[in-house]
Structure formats: C-alpha cells, structure tokens
Regions:
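Short, Lys/Arg-enriched N-terminal segments with co-localized hydrophobic residues
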Residues: 4, 19, 24-31
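N-terminal helix-cap/turn-to-beta initiation motif at the start of protein domains
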Residues: 31-45
C-alpha cells in the first residue's frame, strides 16, 4: 500500500524537524553542559577564612568572616515547564563581624543566554521570610507561584580563559543603588557587593570577598 500523498518511487513523508533534530539536540546538550560547568563552580560551601585572617592581621576589624552556601533546588519546585533548562539555586550568605552574624538568603535562577549565563533573582517563596530561609527549610513550591524580583537587574556572566565574570547595577529605589560584580573559577568565588544611598556607600568593602571551597565540598 502506498503511503498517502507519496508519489510513485518517492520515499514516505517523514515527520517535520527530523533532519534538524540531531543538530538541535547536540546544541541543547552543549548548552546544558556549559550551564552545568558554571553551576558546578558556583555550588557548594565556601568561606573566606584565609582572607579573614589576613585582614584581621592588618587590623581590619570590620571586615567580615563570610560563609557562602549555594545549593541547586529544582527538585523542590513543582510544575517546571517541559524542556526547562534553567537551574534554581538557594544562596545562603552569612557575614560575621565582631561576633554578630547576619544571614542573607536569596533564590536565583541561572539560564543560558547565548554563550553567556544569566542570573535572575526571584522573590523568596510566599510565606518564607529572610530569617531562617535555607535550602533545608525550603518546602516544595509551585513554579507558577514564583516571581522574579522587580528590583534586581539580571546579571550576565561571560567566560574568559576559564573564569566567569559579570554582574549588574540595580536601583532598588531612586536613591538606593546596588552594584554586584563577581568572578567564578576553580580557584573559588570573588564577590563584590556595594549599596549606596544618595551616592554614599552604606554597605560593602574596599576589596572583594574571596571565597574558597571548604574541604567538605571539594570538587572531585
């Protein structure tokens, strides 16, 4: 029996996009590998113990001992769109100065943007306050209930010689400016964050915080 619509001697019609499925699949795999490499550098437990000791020796008493814990959390988000390629990450930052510790948690989404990686900040899930929010305390949440931050300008990271770097500037209010610049590599994380009110710095340091991966999360 002839395939409907096929002329004598012609091959049966093939489903659309078969010819381009191979290249498209390879491109998607390459994209995912690039994003995976980025998140492998970013995720885990880090601190700036070595830098902190150096700053203390210089008499910089106000420079913090900082810990950074980054954990992928897609497993806790229900209803991700089919073919979703992004990686949600819970970022837990802890800053200790003169014996007092301040916690600063965030929920980020990392996606591929061409050859670059884009960071989009999300509001914490409804009912979750910044006090005590961690990957461990985060419950399951529906993707549709998550909202991108309206204040934070997405950051874009570019890879140069194995080092990812990028950041953004956000105007939280007409007078309050937040500036972020980061570098990620196998050596660790370099993070510079400043907050300015009417041009006067109210948060941040003269040098970036230099995080190194702690032994319990050393990369294989």
């Amino acid at each position: 029996m002839k395939t409907p619509g096929a002329a004598d001697g012609a091959s049966p019609a093939r489903p659309g996009n078969v010819l381009c499925a191979g290249p498209a699949r390879r491109e998607r795999r390459r994209t995912m590998e690039r994003l995976q490499q980025f998140t492998q550098l970013l995720c885990g437990s880090f601190d700036n113990a070595a830098q902190f000791r150096q700053m203390q020796a210089k008499g910089e008493a106000s420079f913090p001992f900082a810990r950074h814990v980054n954990t992928p959390c897609n497993e806790k988000i229900r209803g991700l769109p089919q073919g979703f390629d992004g990686v949600f990450v819970v970022e837990e930052s802890y800053y200790t100065v003169n014996g007092r510790t301040h916690a600063s948690p965030h929920l980020f989404l990392f996606t591929q943007q061409g050859e670059n990686i884009k960071l989009t900040s999300y509001d914490l899930p409804q009912g979750c306050g910044k006090a005590g929010f961690t990957f461990e305390t985060m419950g399951e949440v529906a993707f549709g209930d998550l909202s991108p931050s309206k204040k934070f300008t997405p950051a874009v990271y570019t890879c140069r010689g194995g080092v990812w770097e990028g950041g953004s500037t956000s105007m939280f209010t007409p007078a309050l400016k937040f500036t972020l610049f980061e570098r990620f590599s196998s050596e660790g994380l370099e993070v510079s964050e400043t907050m300015e009110m009417n041009g006067k710095r109210t948060f941040g340091y003269d040098v970036p915080i230099l995080y190194r991966r702690t032994e319990d999360t050393a990369q294989a």
